[in-house]
């Protein structure tokens, strides 16, 4: 599984469940290479860290001269979620962040991602920092983190050994 696979699965499920909650708001992957200017109302998420868990697993399934070598590593990625709201149907940025946090912790979200090979761990508490925006006004920037787990795989070309001839010599 790749970073893009995980981010697409998370974004798709967030959009689906926000729509079910009656909240039609864009969900953006943060820090994209092309910026299009300021948006007023959106939810942004981005990876904040990634850690391998345990040891890398190796398995083999020989097929002819190919060893069928496969390596797998369980990873845990931390996503940070933020909401930027100027004016959105009476919701504040904290309201939207709280709804998204509830969605991340919900059974439908967890189960939908589990079916795609992504595990979801409990979201953290909401942080409430403020910053000075591009107009010189204070703006609330609530955020929280949650972790997902998934497996990355690697299939290196490894030749299979077909015969081993011991050659033992006396010393």
What are the roles of these predicted feature ranges?
Residues 95, 103-153:
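Acidic-leaning, charged glycine-interspersed low-complexity segments
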Residues 64-71, 133:
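Short beta-strand/turn micro-motifs at beta-sheet edges
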